[in-house]
Amino acid sequence: MNKRELGNSGEEKAVEFLKKMGYEILHRNFRCKLGEVDIIAKEGNTIVFVEVKTRRSLKFGYPSEAITMTKQRHLKRVAEYFVQRQKAKNCMYRFDVVEVYMNVKNEVLDINLIKNAF
């Protein structure tokens, strides 16, 4: 399984997890001229922009550590674009991170949700 397949599998598991946590999934892999966000969901009245990071080991650190300041800025721009496009300027929104840990058999070992990650 290559990195893209691992990432896609992790996103599938993250969507299942978020649904169980009561999130309503609005979009997956939302793309615009400013960038891309893995999942856009809604929890209550809050729009949640979710970045999913999937790992097989901690060899390169925790998954959330891979979300650099540059990536955070890109995600914030995409979020602002999305909110403006939806004409929901006064809505509340936040950024969550879902860390998915999988083994070589593509089985989930653990899923960690970080609300208000940045």
Swiss-Prot record:
Natural source organism: Caldicellulosiruptor saccharolyticus (strain ATCC 43494 / DSM 8903 / Tp8T 6331)
Superkingdom is Bacteria
Name the record gives this protein: UPF0102 protein Csac_2148
Say which family it is in.
Belongs to the UPF0102 family.
Q: Which PANTHER family match?
A: UPF0102 PROTEIN YRAN (PTHR34039:SF1)
State the Gene Ontology terms under molecular function. Answer: nucleic acid binding
* InterPro entries associated with the record: Restrct_endonuc-II-like, tRNA_endonuc-like_dom_sf, UPF0102_YraN-like
- UniProt xrefs under Pfam families: UPF0102
